[in-house]
Structure formats: structure tokens, C-alpha cells
Amino acid sequence: MGGLFWRSALRGLRCGPRAPGPSLLVRHGSGGPSWTRERTLVAVKPDGVQRRLVGDVIQRFERRGFTLVGMKMLQAPESVLAEHYQDLRRKPFYPALIRYMSSGPVVAMVWEGYNVVRASRAMIGHTDSAEAAPGTIRGDFSVHISRNVIHASDSVEGAQREIQLWFQSSELVSWADGGQHSSIHPA
């Protein structure tokens, strides 16, 4: 029980004002551990948007204690998709991937939090829905490897590149109070 309490407490850990940029390293106390507050790109793909899964995805990230700092729905331009998937250009499925990703709207989001890159990868599950564990987004909602509902950055460096590709800095919010402000409760 104690371990569960501390894991929950760490998930909701809020740091002071953010420095510019998608990643921030914060040290708590002298000689204490390092806590990395990061940003990552998460995109609900056209099949997820069409199946109205955006709310379920947002709910999972919010329950995990992450802070939404940017979100938009768009018909992804082929130029953005080509740059986003540049590492897959030589793969035989690349043309079909670009057609699929441009077949309908995508909901792109930037989430911020403690180790959010690694945590989001665990939350979305294996790329192949047949191998994705139940309880993961793909394990619960994906029906085929080519229609796997969601994308999440696979590294801090990849997240930085992808966020800059999909968002302008003016489209991202910096929570001055660490995301703890509530409009329902007076300050």
C-alpha cells in the first residue's frame, strides 16, 4: 500500500515555473535525486478520431497526472507527415501510412509531466495491436497494426523534434502554477 501511495504522489508531482523548451531537469534538495519534467507529442490518428476515442485518450493522460499544454485537430499536411515519418521512407508500407494519416483529421496534443515520454509509450502499448497488452490504449482500442489509434514520441529528442514540427511555441501553454490551478476552487 505504501508503494502505491508514493507512486501516486510522484505522478502528481508539480515543479516550479518551467524553463523554456520541451524538457526541464529539476533537482529537489541538495544531493537528492533528479526528476525530469518533460514534454511529449501524442497524436490520435484518423481511426481514433473517427471512432470518437479522443476523450478516452485525454482521460487516461489526465488520470495519470500529466498536464495538457497544447492540442489541436487538423488535417495533417503531407509535408508534415513526410517529415514526421522520415525514418520510415524506405519501408514498403510508407505510402500506405501517409495515405492513412492524411485520410482524416488527427488530434495532436502536447503533454507535460514527470518522465512523460517513457510513461506515454507504456500507456499506448505495442505498435501491433495483436501484441498490445490489455489496459494499454492500443490493447483496448486498436483493431489492426495499420490502424493503431495513437502515436506517442519514442524519446525526449524525438519529442522535441515532433513538437516543433506540429506546434508553434505560441500554441503551447506554460502553466505558471505547475498546472494545479482550478477554475472551480477560488485561489
Curated annotation (Swiss-Prot):
The keyword Electron transport does not apply. The active site is at H151. It is found in: Mitochondrion intermembrane space; Mitochondrion matrix. Binding to anionic phospholipids, predominantly to cardiolipin inhibits its phosphotransfer activity. Widely distributed. Found at very high levels in prostate, heart, liver, small intestine, and skeletal muscle tissues, and in low amounts in the brain and in blood leukocytes. Major role in the synthesis of nucleoside triphosphates other than ATP. The ATP gamma phosphate is transferred to the NDP beta phosphate via a ping-pong mechanism, using a phosphorylated active-site intermediate. Through the catalyzed exchange of gamma-phosphate between di- and triphosphonucleosides participates in regulation of intracellular nucleotide homeostasis. Binds to anionic phospholipids, predominantly to cardiolipin; the binding inhibits its phosphotransfer activity. Changing R90D: Abolishes cardiolipin-containing membrane binding; decreases lipid transfer and pro-apoptotic activity; does not change phosphotransfer activity. It catalyses: a 2'-deoxyribonucleoside 5'-diphosphate + ATP = a 2'-deoxyribonucleoside 5'-triphosphate + ADP; a ribonucleoside 5'-diphosphate + ATP = a ribonucleoside 5'-triphosphate + ADP; a cardiolipin(in) = a cardiolipin(out). One of its GO terms (cellular component) is mitochondrial intermembrane space. One of its GO terms (biological process) is CTP biosynthetic process. The keyword Magnesium applies. It comes from the Eukaryota. It comes from Homo sapiens. ATP binds at K45, F93, R121, T127, R138, N148. GO terms for molecular function: ATP binding; cardiolipin binding; GTPase binding; metal ion binding; nucleoside diphosphate kinase activity; protein-containing complex binding. Disulfide bonds: none annotated. This is Nucleoside diphosphate kinase, mitochondrial. Residues 1-28 form a transit peptide. Keywords: ATP-binding, Kinase, Lipid-binding, Magnesium, Membrane, Metal-binding, Mitochondrion, Nucleotide metabolism, Nucleotide-binding, Transferase, Transit peptide. The lineage of its organism: Eukaryota, Metazoa, Chordata, Craniata, Vertebrata.
